[in-house]
Regions:
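Amphipathic alpha-helical repeat scaffolds of TPR domains
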Residues: 21-46, 72-91, 115-131, 154-170
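Intrinsically disordered, low-complexity, charge-biased linker/tail regions
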Residues: 50, 138-173
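Alpha-helical repeat scaffolds
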Residues: 9-16, 45-70, 95-109, 133-150
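N-terminal alpha-helical scaffold/docking segments in eukaryotic complex subunits
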Residues: 1-20, 27
Length: 173
């Protein structure tokens, strides 16, 4: 449904499934990301009224909070939370507080799984500066194949991360 841009139908299916299986990590991460994505792209997707009518702006932080509680030691959850929260901290609360939380989630994901190139890429990107530029550029190159492999599946989460984390062009410039 996501692939066919049937977002309202996808929302209804996610909502029903999450009500039945709120402990399912794969369901949580896809539902959470779906909610974040439609909030981030509401104007482009022409979903502004739908988001307001269904209180997505309060549902998203609630589902995020579920994930933070249940998966606080899961590097994949921390990566997804960190990346999304860092981009739009105001979706979750006070901007500076949540911006720092986003960076902290990315750092925790990397610390829990320091050999994971994608988590390292996201973490270094969150603290990017001239001092870590070379290391960041190098991890962009090293992570490229893993990005394409890990995010090769269906759904918004996979297509989004496959596109935004494949940074080989940026690193080679």
């Amino acid at each position: 449904m996501e692939k066919d841009e049937k977002y309202i139908l996808a929302y209804e299916e996610y909502k029903k499934a999450y009500f039945k299986e709120s402990e399912n990590f794969d369901l949580w991460k896809n539902y959470y990301f779906f909610l974040w994505y439609i909030m981030a792209e509401d104007t482009a997707l022409k979903l502004t009224n739908f988001i307001k009518q269904n209180s997505i702006e309060t549902l998203l932080p609630s589902i995020a909070s579920d994930g933070i509680k249940k998966y606080k030691l899961n590097p994949e959850a921390l990566f997804i939370l960190g990346y999304t929260v860092s981009l739009f901290p105001y979706f979750f609360g006070e901007y500076l507080e949540w911006e720092e939380k986003g960076k902290s989630f990315l750092e925790s994901a990397y610390n829990l799984s320091s050999s994971d190139k994608i988590y390292k890429l996201a973490y270094l990107g969150s603290i990017y500066n001239q001092e870590n530029k070379d290391e960041y550029d190098e991890i962009c190159l090293q992570a490229a194949n893993e990005v394409k492999s890990r995010f090769s599946g269906n759904g918004l989460l996979n297509s989004y991360f496959s596109e935004v984390l494949y940074r080989i062009d940026r690193a080679s410039q």
